[in-house]
Amino acid sequence: MDEVKLDLARHAAAQAGLANVEFRQLDVRDWVEPASYDAVFCRFVLHHLSEPMDLLRRMWAAVRPGGALIVEDPDFDGWCCHPPNEGFDFFLRSYGEVIKRRGGDHAYGRKLYAGFLAAGIPAPEVHAVQPVWTAGEGKTLAWSTLEATADAIVAERVATAQEVTASLETLWQFTVDTQTLISGPRIFQVSSRR
């Protein structure tokens, strides 16, 4: 997350009158702050990590007594569209492969509950949602994710720049078609109180 997004979050919190919220940019690979927070929230991070258990343990350690750890992570195998679309299929294959080559697990969401248990985090609660769109900003999520990861797809030699460009065009035409449907990934939320 960059400083621009953090400034937007700070502004939104100030507009809402929230004075007890802090937004900071930290490297999760070496972040350690035991018993420092009433709530620790982590969204869409663990599937990028080769050692998600390490961060889960450190996040749990950062929660004060009476506080909560809330983690959301996707299971990208759950994405779908209708009717079938080559650009969408390219996005799923390419994005998943980049995550894998960089040491992550694009389906970590379904493993999150087991991760809590293995990390010794007691009594986790589990919820899952899967957004679906026929129009609007949410429907552009697959396209915008493919666009944002285009350089990584080429750098990892998953596909050529020309293949990415062609798939972006195919996926965009599909996205703006009001007769089509695109889902997001299944999103697993697991939480526990200390």
Model regions and ranges:
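Short glycine-dipeptide loop
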Residues: 63-69
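A short His-aromatic
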Residues: 47-48
